[in-house]
Amino acid sequence: MINCGVQEPNIVNIAAGLASQGKRVIVYGVAGFVLYKAYEQIKLNIKGWAEHSGSVIFVNAGANGCYNALGRGHLLDDDALLMKALDIPLYDPIDRSTFVRYVKEGLQQTGVRYIRLGWDNEVWRKKE
């Protein structure tokens, strides 16, 4: 586990380097920070060459608008379009078990995937 704090472009570059060596990487972020701040790194370093060797799973919380009250920077309103533009499959799990399944599947495959999460409802709080 590597925590780069609010250095989204750097964590994507680290993920690209690890994936290029065959590693399986999960990049977690809140709202649109990873996608918006590091889009060029995702485009060039993940899609450009790292996806062919390893696995990168982007997990992004806040898809249901639970962070919107924190301001424009926390809005996640066009993430699906950004991922589609890069031909990155989008997964939108409805509960914890579906999320776990998507992550396990992603770790077994080479390539990139994007999982968007919402946290502020009873389905996500319920432990299975």
Which residues fall in each region the model found?
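Conserved thiamine diphosphate
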Residues: 7, 17-128
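Short pre-catalytic strand/loop immediately N-terminal to key active-site residues, enriched for Gly-Thr
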Residues: 1-3
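Glycine-rich oxoanion-binding loops at beta->alpha junctions
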Residues: 6-8, 12
